[in-house]
């Protein structure tokens, strides 16, 4: 089995924040693939289902972003799974809006949710990095990620969540590069990317 973690903050106040795009994608996976109803456990909410023959548990930590690792550690301990069976979907300010990159391990780029997870379980889990853009100055980052997506951004946000959810089975199968490529091509076909920009994915897909 695999654990898919979406990062965000709980509550209506944060629901539309850029920081919550991980929650949004995980919610869409549950909706589009007929997962079980959400229930409270592991200091979060979970839903269970199957993607491309792989058993998946979705987890949305309710600890607030900075303590996400506590929920991930609880779930990983319960299921007795290692870092290689965990995928974390999170907002990424170092990527342009709507861009997606997939990688195993690496730095945390100042992301407090990733910092907490790495502190609790180690650093070698899969990250599905969902671009939300950079506001241009370090002092603006806090308000940027805790701000809601603008009305003009909603079309690509909705499209990205749907396309990522439709192709999530590739992540379940360990085909990270194929996932990134499929998302890129589908978003490009909808007109959200420039044609001259190439998507780059993970390295595990052979």
From Swiss-Prot:
Superkingdom in the source lineage: Bacteria
Record-linked SUPFAM superfamilies: Peptidyl-tRNA hydrolase-like (SSF53178)
Top enzyme class: hydrolase
Record-level Gene Ontology MF annotations: peptidyl-tRNA hydrolase activity; tRNA binding
Compartment list: Cytoplasm
Binding site for tRNA: 14, 64, 66, 112
UniProt entry tagged with the keyword S-adenosyl-L-methionine: no
UniProt KW Cytoplasm keyword: yes
Active site: 19
Main location: cytoplasm
Family to which this protein belongs: Belongs to the PTH family.
Family matches, as PANTHER family: PEPTIDYL-TRNA HYDROLASE (PTHR17224:SF1)
Quaternary context: Monomer.
The protein's name in its UniProt record: Peptidyl-tRNA hydrolase
Gene name in the database record: pth
């Amino acid at each position: 089995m695999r654990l898919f973690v979406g990062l965000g903050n709980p509550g209506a106040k944060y629901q539309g924040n850029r920081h919550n795009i991980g929650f949004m994608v995980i919610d869409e996976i549950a909706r589009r693939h007929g997962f079980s109803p959400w229930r409270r456990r592991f200091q979060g909410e979970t839903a269970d289902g199957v993607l491309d023959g792989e058993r998946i548990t979705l987890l949305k930590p309710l600890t607030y972003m900075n303590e996400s690792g506590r929920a991930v550690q609880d779930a990983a301990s319960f299921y007795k799974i290692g870092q290689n069976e965990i995928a974390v979907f999170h907002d990424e300010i170092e990527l342009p809006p709507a861009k997606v990159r997939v990688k195993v391990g690496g730095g945390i780029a100042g992301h407090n949710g990733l910092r907490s997870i790495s502190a609790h379980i180690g650093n070698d889990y899969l990250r599905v990095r969902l671009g939300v853009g950079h506001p241009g100055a370090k002092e603006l980052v806090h308000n940027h990620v805790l701000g809601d997506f603008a009305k003009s951004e909603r079309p690509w946000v909705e499209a990205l969540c749907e396309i990522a959810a439709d192709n999530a089975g590739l992540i379940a199968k360990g085909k990270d590069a194929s996932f990134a490529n499929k998302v890129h091509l589908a978003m490009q076909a909808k007109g959200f990317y420039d044609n001259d920009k190439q998507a780059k994915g993970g390295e595990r897909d052979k």
